[in-house]
């Protein structure tokens, strides 16, 4: 794995919804049995090459649950990911409590404005 950090959005970048599905796309996400998310035909072949060269950091608006539904090709699941607009850092699929506490502290004084 390389020393370069490759930060990437997921939806409509690396992963596409069923609404944008192409005939050769590969399903990598299901919800209640229904196909939800897809990689392009090339993505499963290219991801191993990417993760050998760089640290892949997905950054997404997805919730933890939505992110964890993604079935990454063998050996390509990112060790870290930012979910919930960066509020939650996952390390090997587990919430980084220190990151979460720091995120909450940043918005503490602005909750009223954010809720409006």
Model-derived features with residue positions:
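Active-site phosphate-binding/coordination module
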Residues: 39-116
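Generic structural motif recognizing short loop/turn segments at the entrances and edges of beta-strands
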Residues: 1-2, 86
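Active-site neighborhood of HAD-like aspartate-dependent phosphohydrolases
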Residues: 2-6, 10-58
């Amino acid at each position: 794995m390389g020393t370069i950090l490759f930060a990437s959005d997921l939806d409509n970048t690396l992963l596409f919804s069923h609404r944008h599905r192409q005939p050769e796309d590969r399903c990598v996400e299901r919800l209640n049995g229904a196909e939800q998310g897809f990689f392009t035909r090339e993505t499963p072949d290219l991801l191993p090459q990417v993760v050998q060269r760089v640290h892949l950091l997905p950054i997404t608006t997805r919730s933890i649950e939505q992110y964890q539904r993604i079935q990454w090709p063998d050996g390509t699941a990112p060790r870290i990911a930012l979910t919930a607009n960066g509020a939650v850092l996952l390390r090997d699929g587990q919430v980084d409590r220190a990151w979460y506490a720091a995120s909450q502290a940043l918005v503490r004084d602005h909750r009223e404005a954010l809720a409006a």
